[in-house]
Structure formats: structure tokens, C-alpha cells
Regions:
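A post-motif C-terminal structural segment
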Residues: 22-222
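Mobile, glycine-rich extracellular loop/lid and propeptide segments
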Residues: 1-6, 11-23
Length: 222
């Protein structure tokens, strides 16, 4: 869809709360036999129609004798930046914002980057003409795969805030805006309780994601 829209004169942006070369986001700009071919996937950005890409940094597993990824992308006219904030405008031209970390919503601080911010900045940059923004809430799936129900609930709420940013634009341009919300395959099984013993309130006591909890435990083991 990104290529089709670009061929029809639309500016195209892709924003994600996970890795720029992770499968969900990469499926909109790359073709590969294996999702683990991170360098070859990311290098395809040089020929992609994307005007803007925002998300967590590439894995940068450089293959032997292959050119540094930043060099490849800069040669294609992309400007590389490492942060996105509410108070700063996105640079002109084609931009790739590769952030060091985009935390789970449960782990986020007030200043942490998030999908809603990315949608807002994409709208600001692309709204001068016809545009398409693809927003990927991949951390919902990651939380499900981790069997982390509290994190999944928080990520779903965070995704709702991102949709709200799109809806704000729709409210100002109702005749020119289409918002489509879709899901990929279900990931992971979630359990709230057994035999009717369901207590959603228990999830309010969880303060961090399982990923952050595991990292803390591993630090104590060293």
C-alpha cells in the first residue's frame, strides 16, 4: 500500500513503537525470506517511497563486508536523527528517526517517546498535501507474546491515544480523511482467571513490564 499511494502522489510516513526493521513495520517497505535478515531489510529503505520513518533503532547487525547502514541510507538522501520531541519540528526532506529506545507504556516516563507522539509529528510534517501515515502498535503483540496482560492493557490504551491524534486531524478535515484500524494475527494467550475468578484490579498493582522486570532480575544475578 505504501508503494501504491506514493505512485499516486501521496507522501508516505511509517511510524512504529518497536524496531524499524522489525517484521511488522518492515512489511511496509521491504521484502525478505526471513524476518531475521535485519541488515538487508533495513538497506531496502534506500529504494522505498517513505518520506518519514520513526521508531526504535535498527538492530544494526552488519553483515561481513557490507557498508555501514547509516552510510547506505544517507547516500539515498535520507536524513538520520536520533530523537523526536513534542517541541521540535521534524527536519525537512526525507527523514529516518531511529530512537535508542521506545519503552513499553508501563515503563514510560513523562518525556518518553510513544506512538501518539509519532503520529502527531508525522501529521505535522506531511499534512501540506495528500498523505498516508501507517502507525504500527507492535508492542501490543509483544506484550501478548510475553503473556504480560497488564502491559497489553497499557499498550492498547497507548494505541488508542495514537488513534486519537489521527481523529483530531479527521475532526478538522472530515471530508478528506480516512482512518482504518486493523489487527494482525493474534499473538499469545492471555488469562484473567479460572472458573469465574476474574479480578482485573490485580493488574493495577503491576508497575513495569515483564521485560523490565526480567532485566532487573538479571542485574541482581550478576
Amino acid at each position: 500500500i505504501t508503494s501504491i499511494m506514493a505512485q499516486n502522489g501521496y507522501a508516505v510516513g511509517l511510524v512504529t513503537d518497536a524496531g524499524l526493521d522489525a517484521a511488522a513495520a518492515a512489511s511496509f517497505y521491504a521484502h525478505s525470506e526471513k524476518r531475521q535478515n535485519y541488515y538487508d531489510i533495513a538497506a531496502q529503505l534506500k529504494d522505498s517511497p517513505l518520506s518519514l520513518l520513526i521508531g526504535q533503532d535498527f538492530k544494526r547487525r552488519k553483515a561481513f563486508q557490507k557498508e555501514d547502514l547509516d552510510v547506505v541510507l544517507k547516500k539515498s538522501g535520507r536524513r538520520m536523527v536520533s530523537r523526536v520531541t513534542a517541541g521540535e519540528k521534524m527536519p525537512s526532506g526525507k527523514v529516518i528517526a531511529a530512537l535508542k529506545n521506545v519503552p513499553f507504556a508501563l515503563d514510560a516516563k513523562a518525556e518518553s517517546p510513544n506512538l501518539a507522539l509519532f503520529v502527531e509529528k508525522a501529521v505535522e510534517k506531511l499534512q501540506g498535501g495528500d498523505f498516508l501515515i501507517v502507525a504500527v502498535g507492535e508492542k501490543i503483540g509483544l506484550a501478548a507474546e510475553n503473556r504480560d496482560t497488564a502491559a497489553l492493557i497499557a499498550e492498547t490504551a497507548a494505541f488508542d491515544l495514537a488513534v486519537k491524534k489521527a481523529f483530531d486531524f479527521y475532526a478538522a478535515h472530515p471530508q478528506d480523511t480516512l482512518i482504518v484500524v486493523a489487527s494482525t494475527a493474534e499473538a499469545g494467550g492471555l488469562v484473567l482467571g479460572t472458573d469465574g475468578a476474574v479480578s482485573p484490579a490485580v493488574f493495577k498493582t503491576q508497575k513495569v513490564s515483564i521485560d523490565t522486570f526480567k532485566s532487573a532480575i538479571n542485574r541482581f544475578r550478576r
